[in-house]
Amino acid sequence: MADPAECSIKVMCRFRPLNEAEILRGDKFIPKFKGEETVVIGQGKPYVFDRVLPPNTTQEQVYNACAKQIVKDVLEGYNGTIFAYGQTSSGKTHTMEGKLHDPQLMGIIPRIAHDIFDHIYSMDENLEFHIKVSYFEIYLDKIRDLLDVSKTNLAVHEDKNRVPYVKGCTERFVSSPEEVMDVIDEGKANRHVAVTNMNEHSSRSHSIFLINIKQENVETEKKLSGKLYLVDLAGSEKVSKTGAEGAVLDEAKNINKSLSALGNVISALAEGTKTHVPYRDSKMTRILQDSLGGNCRTTIVICCSPSVFNEAETKSTLMFGQRAKTIKNTVSVNLELTAEEWKKKYEKEKEKNKALKSVLQHLEMELNRWRNGEAVPEDEQISAKDQKSLEPCDNTPIIDNITPVVDGISAEKEKYDEEITSLYRQLDDKDDEINQQSQLAEKLKQQMLDQDELLASTRRDYEKIQEELTRLQIENEAAKDEVKEVLQALEELAVNYDQKSQEVEDKTRANEQLTDELAQKTTTLTTTQRELSQLQELSNHQKKRATEILNLLLKDLGEIGGIIGTNDVKTLADVNGVIEEEFTMARLYISKMKSEVKSLVNRSKQLESAQMDSNRKMNASERELAACQLLISQHEAKIKSLTDYMQNMEQKRRQLEESQDSLSEELAKLRAQEKMHEVSFQDKEKEHLTRLQDAEEVKKALEQQMESHREAHQKQLSRLRDEIEEKQRIIDEIRDLNQKLQLEQERLSSDYNKLKIEDQEREVKLEKLLLLNDKREQAREDLKGLEETVSRELQTLHNLRKLFVQDLTTRVKKSVELDSDDGGGSAAQKQKISFLENNLEQLTKVHKQLVRDNADLRCELPKLEKRLRATAERVKALESALKEAKENAMRDRKRYQQEVDRIKEAVRAKNMARRAHSAQIAKPIRPGHYPASSPTAVHAVRGGGGGSSNSTHYQK
């Protein structure tokens, strides 16, 4: 470490403009600026700082005034600190961070990230840099890592030089401004902010961004290191103004407490008389211990509000800045000595120690002589000048055994120092233990949250299962009710069927009895008629008068009976004729509908088979067409690439010919000059033989040089040709890949359009099938109505049959009583019976035909439903295939983009490898840390206008 030097803390004062709330409130602008270093608040005293920045100061001007010099100092091996102090909503975060990615409004931290690398790019190429960054916040007086949110209570320890540091904080190695900005974005996203009455984005914690830079000269092995603390303090708050409550109020308490501890440290350092500085009252002051009164160049930016509403806080902030301006820091370069330098320093200290020992011996001898009462002459005494020249640089006494009191005090002081050291060590151990317990508590808390989430998800799943079980139970109950209803209906149908069967049997037996009785009566009637005719023949002559009267009576009765029978038959014939006509029409309609359904099914099967054949042919043709198109596109791409390659080669050939011509011209000039020299030297050949020999040697050297130039030119030409061939090969591969991907994309688009058209066709077919299903349902309903009509007509027939049987029984009885009038009535009754039996037989046939047709339609129904389900499944399969095709297209597009990015990275890396040499930024590889960009090599950034290249000579 170099010799220390004393410097003061720089204090910059920045006033923000009035915000909208203050303008609407009508607040007065109270600061008055006098020059660049003085500001007056109202009618009060002037406040003088290193620089006063008015509201119209740009972010770039703030950076140039506050931070630009510190960046240079850090790169020269010094420590640096920049932090913003002020009340809430005074512009601290805007000053330190601003808008991170806005070139005009970005603050000090992002500008430093770019400026550091700009300085490195302009430094010596023999320098190698290691840059690592950390980002943490102090929230509720606990150190929380913003790059690893699981570390919530980190401890502050001291290294071997008694410099505080945060133990266990995440460190990221960076090699470019973009990586630094990525770290800042990541940490900023994890920082605590809240909304108050004074600020919409109020910082609820102190954030510290630490940049650690180590540089090494690879030739001289000189090593320098510097740390840069960039601190964004949370603002002091008045609860009456911010309206904080709840958790925000607790945060405000801790913020004010830590800022009060910072004020106490500043006051103690400003007074300069206190032996104890309360660094340990707050973790923030403990971390900034080296920045306040230690080995660090520190700049404080005090941010103030210009509003009269915040006048008291503004004056308090200005007083804080004036106190801080009086603090002196002792800074020195953080230099790591080499072995040779340590050896020289050891020899120097050894010589100094030897001189001090000789002085000590002379003084002891002189003291003994004085004690023995001997007077020592002045020329033998050691003068004060000699003592001063031989004193060590520190003011420790040379003679430490003058009085035993000094030894006792030193021993007691060492004892106290050891005790303080042990207490500090115990405190650090307690901090470690608290940190471990906090991390364990956080892990347990996270596990509890995970268990709660798991329990909640289990509870949700249980509720879903319960709902599903309830729904299934309800459906089961409904199904049971339906089954019961169906069984009940079947039982009722069975009972009705048994009843109807019993009734039919009863009616059949009654009909048979009536038929037997009718046959008996007919036989009896025939016998009686025969006997009557015999009796009439026998008594014809005797009863002629009676016979004529009887014949007249029979004739009248026959006419009356015929008239009655004819009317009955005619009425019955009309009724039965209407029923038969309706049954015939229904039978014809059902048979016609059945034939149409069968023809439609056959037509649909034919169309499906034809469509499948056409689809197969079309798919085969499309595959052949796609293959041909791919082949044609590949050939066209190759032809185009070869044409471009030939053009490039022609241009390069012309360039080489031009260069060859220029070289030939130069060679001709040299030969002409050589000939001129030979002609000029021929006259003086004898006199200047020695000079000619020298000329021959020069000529040989020139020819050798030309030959070496020719060989170098040839090598360079071959190398350029190899590079051109390699680049052309890469370009051809990229073009071929691009052509293939474009063709694949076009093929996928065409497949998508085809699938879409097929989907539309399937929807049309599905609509047709649904329409056909509706027609079938309508036919089923019509058939049910027809069956009901047939049942009613059968019931009517049964009723008519009963009436007919009753009427027949009545007439038979009458015919028995009226023997003479039975002939005509018997014929009419037989005619009625035969007609009714024929109608009954026809109705039975029609009923059976309707039942058969209904059964056929019911058999066709499952087939049609199966085809409908198959069509729906086919539609779903087409939809899933379409979705899968879209996903494949997206994956191919992503893969193509990744391949293009990879090729771009490879080309960029090759281009960067040709850049000029400058200072390097090495990025070591650490076990357990995933790399941010390339995992294969260590990145090194080169300055002097260069880019980044790969450096594999240093890995950790």
UniProtKB/Swiss-Prot annotation:
PROSITE patterns xrefs:
KINESIN_MOTOR_1 (PS00411), KINESIN_MOTOR_2 (PS50067)
Keywords per UniProt: ATP-binding, Cell projection, Coiled coil, Cytoplasm, Cytoskeleton, Hydrolase, Microtubule, Motor protein, Nucleotide-binding, Phosphoprotein, Transport
Which residues are recorded as modified (Phosphothreonine)? 403
Q: Which GO terms describe its cellular component?
A: axon cytoplasm; axonal growth cone; ciliary rootlet; cytoplasm; dendrite cytoplasm; distal axon; GABA-ergic synapse; kinesin complex
**Disordered: annotated span:** 910-956
What's the Enzyme Commission number for this chain?
Answer: 3.6.4.-
Give GO terms: molecular function aspect only: apolipoprotein receptor binding; ATP binding; ATP hydrolysis activity; microtubule binding; microtubule motor activity
Q: Which residue numbers delimit the Kinesin motor domain? A: 8-327
- Which residues, by range, are in coiled-coil regions? 406-923
Any one Gene Ontology BP term: motor neuron axon guidance
| Residues noted as binding ATP in the record, renumbered to the chain | 87, 89-94, 99
Annotated stretches, region: Microtubule-binding = 174-315
Q: PANTHER family under this entry? A: CENTROMERE PROTEIN E, KINESIN HEAVY CHAIN ISOFORM 5C
Q: What does this protein do?
A: Microtubule-associated force-producing protein that may play a role in organelle transport. Has ATPase activity. Involved in synaptic transmission. Mediates dendritic trafficking of mRNAs. Required for anterograde axonal transportation of MAPK8IP3/JIP3 which is essential for MAPK8IP3/JIP3 function in axon elongation.
Write down what this protein is called.
Kinesin heavy chain isoform 5C
Question: What is the scientific name of the source organism?
Answer: Mus musculus (Mouse)
Gene behind this protein: Kif5c
